[in-house]
């Protein structure tokens, strides 16, 4: 490559795979949603905390939820001391490190929330990103299931604060201990059965995807998919498979509770789990949360390898159209559970903890589908046009802008290079500006400004076909003294807002 080629070669602009640029509308929508979620968390007595994007990799370690890649899935680098650092995979492991490192200063139970980006070094795909936002709430140091019940109630209140109606969401609750009891009852207890239990957990995790019959195959000899690929099963017999499918198939806990209790009666862990579910059910019912809002549902299997007790999931139940044009239930927008082992691994002593995480990006999509987000349009700035470029004129334009800003009105002075007035109005139109402020030499000599209602002008433009007549009519344009600029702009903006309200 010669010197001339080097000089003319351009760097290719490209977005990394699995990442997205966020528009102003998306940023404002997320801010609106987070403010509503934060208000609920604060009402429950939770306080904010913030941890860094990077953690030492061993602080994340084998507790990464992606069980197939326990020591991968993260973006990592080494620092000057040859210590491995990784971008956080979730917000829970950093919280565990924070609690352990500051244990003597923290008041237990420690009730905290935080929002932030997390990063996954995984293959990206449709709806699967390498960077996304989560909003978590956790209670550390509370061993009783009342803390888990409170999490479920807070999730329900959060859904409603976001405008999701009852019937369009449900908080589903299960307990890892109950499943452990079921597995022990069918002969899958003990260290020697660890791998089989993991295979069973992964099989029932596919319940929503493959249905009961698909899970039956995965619990048995195995399943062949449409492409012909075969997944080896857990190798259970029909009796074992039947009891697992009974457990995950319970839809009415009140009617099936006795039968489930009998199934795990011989296992201490299973009986403890059933008792915890009954306690959670009693607490939420006493607080006025019926089963249409918080439901005991043994088919919830999220993170059962990760959690140690109750698990819960926030599911949206309305239908949406997927990329194949099919009507499907929107599904999960967040969840969590009890993770008593996560802080303890730093401490060498038991530290109970429970919490949940909301997938902000996914929930934002749901709220947009419901028309619950972004309804409050942000008014684009008023544009003060630049008719003359001498210092005195520019100073006046700048003063107009500052007067509007000090009155709480978004405003900008045209900063482009084009001197043509028509180009400035085109800029304002493309910007979505509601008003243009104009002052040429004649207006300046008279101490007045022209205020052009761009919204009304656009509406009326279709009613005047002749361009000459349009210019002469000065449609939607009014002249006012400089001192009345702010008041007139405010009046026009209020009228535009009223028009939008009537039209909406």
Swiss-Prot record:
It is found in: Cytoplasm. Gene3D superfamilies: Anticodon-binding domain, Bira Bifunctional Protein, Domain 2. SUPFAM superfamilies: Class II aaRS ABD-related, Class II aaRS and biotin synthetases. It holds the Pfam family tRNA-synt_His. Disulfide bonds: none annotated. GO terms for cellular component: cytoplasm. It comes from the Bacteria. Keywords: Aminoacyl-tRNA synthetase, ATP-binding, Cytoplasm, Ligase, Nucleotide-binding, Protein biosynthesis. Its EC number is 6.1.1.21. It catalyses: tRNA(His) + L-histidine + ATP = L-histidyl-tRNA(His) + AMP + diphosphate + H(+). One of its GO terms (molecular function) is ATP binding. It is an enzyme of class 6 (ligase). GO terms for biological process: histidyl-tRNA aminoacylation. Belongs to the class-II aminoacyl-tRNA synthetase family. Homodimer. NCBIfam families: hisS. This is Histidine--tRNA ligase. It comes from Rhizobium meliloti (strain 1021) (Ensifer meliloti). The gene is hisS.
């Amino acid at each position: 490559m010669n010197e001339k080629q080097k000089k003319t070669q351009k760097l290719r602009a490209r977005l990394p795979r699995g990442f997205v640029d966020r528009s102003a509308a998306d940023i404002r929508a997320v801010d609106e949603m987070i403010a509503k979620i934060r208000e609920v968390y604060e009402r429950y007595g939770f306080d904010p905390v913030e941890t860094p994007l990077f953690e030492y990799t061993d602080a994340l370690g084998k507790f990464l939820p992606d069980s197939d890649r326990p020591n991968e899935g993260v973006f990592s680098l080494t620092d000057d001391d040859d210590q491995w650092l990784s971008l956080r995979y979730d917000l829970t492991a950093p919280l565990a490190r924070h609690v352990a490192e500051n244990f003597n200063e923290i008041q237990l139970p420690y009730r905290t929330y935080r929002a932030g980006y997390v990063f996954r070094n995984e293959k990206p795909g449709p709806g699967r990103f390498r960077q996304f936002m989560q909003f978590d709430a956790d209670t550390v140091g509370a061993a009783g299931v009342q803390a888990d019940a409170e999490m479920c109630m807070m999730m329900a209140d959060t859904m409603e604060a976001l405008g999701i109606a009852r019937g369009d969401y449900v908080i589903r609750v299960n307990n890892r201990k109950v499943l452990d009891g079921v597995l022990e009852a069918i002969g899958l207890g003990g260290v020697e059965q660890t791998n089989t239990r993991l295979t069973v957990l992964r099989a029932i995790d596919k319940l929503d995807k493959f249905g009961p019959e698909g899970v039956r195959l995965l619990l048995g000899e195995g399943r062949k998919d449409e492409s012909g690929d075969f997944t080896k099963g857990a190798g259970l017999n029909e009796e074992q498979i039947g009891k697992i499918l009974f457990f995950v198939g319970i839809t009415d806990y009140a009617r099936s509770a006795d039968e489930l209790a009998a199934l795990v009666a011989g296992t201490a862990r299973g009986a403890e789990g059933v008792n915890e579910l009954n306690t959670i059910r009693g607490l939420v019912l006493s607080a006025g949360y019926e089963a249409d809002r918080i439901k005991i549902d043994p088919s919830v299997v999220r993170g059962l390898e990760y959690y140690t007790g109750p698990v819960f999931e926030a599911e949206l139940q309305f239908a949406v159209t997927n990329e194949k044009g099919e009507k499907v239930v929107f599904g999960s927008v967040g969840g969590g559970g009890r993770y008593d082992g996560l802080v303890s691994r730093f401490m060498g002593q038991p530290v109970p903890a429970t919490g949940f995480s909301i997938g902000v990006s996914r929930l934002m999509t749901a709220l947009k589908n419901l028309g619950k987000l972004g309804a409050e349009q942000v008014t684009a700035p008023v544009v003060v046009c630049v008719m003359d470029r001498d210092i005195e004129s520019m100073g006046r334009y700048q003063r107009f802008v500052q007067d509007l800003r000090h009155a709480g009105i978004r405003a900008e002075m045209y900063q482009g290079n084009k001197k043509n007035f028509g180009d400035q109005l085109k800029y304002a139109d493309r910007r979505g500006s509601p008003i243009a402020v104009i002052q040429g030499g004649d207006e300046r000599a008279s101490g007045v400004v022209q205020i052009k209602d761009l919204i009304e002008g656009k509406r009326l433009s279709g009613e005047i076909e002749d361009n000459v007549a349009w210019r002469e009519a000065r449609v939607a344009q009014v002249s006012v003294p400089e001192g009345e600029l702010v008041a007139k702009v405010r009046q026009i903006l209020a009228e535009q807002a009223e028009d939008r309200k009537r039209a909406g």
